[in-house]
């Protein structure tokens, strides 16, 4: 039987009652300190996978697989999955769950019992092409930014996060939700919201709605993507939003060395010094850095191509 997502139904997905059995078997309780809210609704995980558009050519990175609801749906599409799980009990049980729910899909799964923020490129033998996850609430933004920076091979991201986090990630300059996460995520690619997710599809039921967010990395980045350049841009973003109600001229005084130099650098980047940091786009921050360190557009394009 074929589904609209292009996946073939060969794996039995987890249901709520099975998750309750697993809780009893493992004698575990969701830990708020780890942001654990487990998705148990099959239609929701199918929706996430459909939004991600992953297929058998993809190597997917999943963060916080929990009991394996989303993991099974990803394997059902034919993708290979590397699941990063900080909870040793859940990490140890996941391969058995996959084996119990499928015929021969376990060979496409690897499980890493690690903190996602310490996960590095060298920890994987194969470069991931996609990130698909129900991100733990407590590390959603840092995990997302860390993995995009650490794994440039990731071309698409599809994640469930708290609704208010989803709004911040996809916010436009000048909006009430626009902030550091919005700007930094847009450094890597185009961000869009893909709908809301009801609290009732999780156990335990959270007090807030979740949102589905998709990121498509730029096919050709408009700016350099090396670590040094990214850190410099992000430094400017942090400065601007630490003092978001100040004019850009005043916010960047310490960075530029003086008020006059701050204004000169902003004007050189075609930015009105009276604008507030909360109105600046990622393009503005990149242009400000380029003009300030003496890079011209030709040099930047050359660096991007190398």
Curated annotation (Swiss-Prot):
Subcellular location: Cytoplasm
Stated family: Belongs to the class I-like SAM-binding methyltransferase superfamily. rRNA adenine N(6)-methyltransferase family. RsmA subfamily.
Gene (name only): rsmA
SUPFAM superfamilies registered for this protein in UniProt: S-adenosyl-L-methionine-dependent methyltransferases (SSF53335)
Protein name as annotated: Ribosomal RNA small subunit methyltransferase A
Keywords: Cytoplasm, Methyltransferase, RNA-binding, rRNA processing, S-adenosyl-L-methionine, Transferase
Keyword Cytoplasm: yes
Gene Ontology, cellular component aspect: cytosol
Keyword Chloroplast in annotation: no
Superkingdom of this protein's organism: Bacteria
Species annotation: Mycobacterium leprae (strain TN)
């Amino acid at each position: 039987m074929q589904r609209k997502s292009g996946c073939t139904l060969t794996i039995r997905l987890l249901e709520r009652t099975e998750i309750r059995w697993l809780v009893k078997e493992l004698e575990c309780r969701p830990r708020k300190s780890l942001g654990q809210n487990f998705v148990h609704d099959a239609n929701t995980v199918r929706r996430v996978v459909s939004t991600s558009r992953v297929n058998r050519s993809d190597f997917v990175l999943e963060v916080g697989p929990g009991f394996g609801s989303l993991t099974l749906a990803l394997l059902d599409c034919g993708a290979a999955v590397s699941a990063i799980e900080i909870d040793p009990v859940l990490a140890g049980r996941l391969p058995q769950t996959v084996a119990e729910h499928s015929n021969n899909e376990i060979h496409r799964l690897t499980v890493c019992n690690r903190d996602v923020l310490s996960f590095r490129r060298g920890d994987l033998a194969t470069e991931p092409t996609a990130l698909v996850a129900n991100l733990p609430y407590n590390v959603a933004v840092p995990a997302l930014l860390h993995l995009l920076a650490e794994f440039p091979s990731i071309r698409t991201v599809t994640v469930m996060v708290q609704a208010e986090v989803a709004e911040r990630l996809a916010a436009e300059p000048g909006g009430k939700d626009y902030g550091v996460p919005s700007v930094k995520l847009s450094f890597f690619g185009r961000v869009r919201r893909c709908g809301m997710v009801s609290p009732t599809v999780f156990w335990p039921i959270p007090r807030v709605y979740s949102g589905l967010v998709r990121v498509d990395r730029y096919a050709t980045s408009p700016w350099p993507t090396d670590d040094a350049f990214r850190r410099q841009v992000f430094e400017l973003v942090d400065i601007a939003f630490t003092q978001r109600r100040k004019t850009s001229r005043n916010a960047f005084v310490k960075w530029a060395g003086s008020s006059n130099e701050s204004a000169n650098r902003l004007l050189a980047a075609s930015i009105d010094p009276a604008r507030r940091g909360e109105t600046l786009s990622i393009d503005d921050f990149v242009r400000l850095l380029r003009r300030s360190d003496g890079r011209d557009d030709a040099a930047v394009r050359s660096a991007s191509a190398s």
